[in-house]
Amino acid sequence: MKKMIYDSLKVLKKVTKRFEIIMVDDGCPEKSGSIAKKLTKKFKNIKVIFHKKNLGYGAALKTGLKYSRSQWIFQTDGDAEYDVNDLLRLIRLTDKSDLIITYRYKKKYNTSRIIISWIYNIILRFLFLTNFKDISTGSRLIKKDIMKKIKLNSNSPFIGAELAIRSKHQGLKVNELGIHTYPRTFGSGSSVSFKNILLTIKDMIKLFLIIKK
């Protein structure tokens, strides 16, 4: 995680002089919390927010959005699965976007995860009449103002899909950019755990019922 933060600092300095990095520790049992604390002491523009217990991927994202003060928010996971240098490509689309989501050029995962992701995206296209290529990636660029127009309810990994779907249904400009992904260098993925799959399905059904009213 430390390497990813240093990489992020390098990239952000190329983009703007005024920025902040917000890390949300969602009750993580690993050493990310102590690493984050050390980094906040070294860099004034880094802050860490702790959840006392694990509230879920979606809850962590909502916390980050709540405390962000910037006009544009680049959200990415802390396991280095995504290249923070993609931000340099994402910002080229800001003039014509309210939200920029990403899709994977090639999915470097095991077969079961690829199948789950494929089925997931097919279901979302069918239920919500969207044509997104891949709505489940954890890297996106969000215009802060859109949070005044949409309310996110999901605490599960469905949060990314909810953000894109609600934005689209509100008539906001949502664009996509292809990216490469890499093997995790920190932590372990939990999005495809049985518990998170059930929570994702639950949040998906809730959003479907809300939108179809």
Model-derived segments and their meaning:
Residues 51-67, 72-74, 81-157, 182-207:
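Acceptor/aglycone-binding surface of glycosyltransferases and processive sugar-polymer synthases
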